[in-house]
């Protein structure tokens, strides 16, 4: 499954 931490880092990188 997709890692929740990876999705959090990707969303924070999008500023």
Curated annotation (Swiss-Prot):
Keyword Secreted: yes
Recorded GO CC terms: extracellular region
Keyword line: Antibiotic, Antimicrobial, Fungicide, Secreted
Places the protein is found: Secreted
Keyword Metal-binding applies: no
GO-annotated biological processes: defense response to bacterium; defense response to fungus; killing of cells of another organism; xenobiotic metabolic process
Domain of life: Eukaryota
Regions crossing the membrane: none
Coarse class of the protein's main subcellular location: secreted
Signal peptide (residue range): none
Additional remarks: Antimicrobial activity is not affected by salt concentration.
Biological role: Possesses antifungal activity against P.infestans but not F.graminearum.
Protein name stated in the entry: Antifungal protein 3
Taxonomic source organism: Malva parviflora
Taxon lineage: Eukaryota, Viridiplantae, Streptophyta, Embryophyta, Tracheophyta
């Amino acid at each position: 499954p997709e890692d929740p931490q990876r999705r959090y880092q990707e969303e924070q990188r999008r500023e």
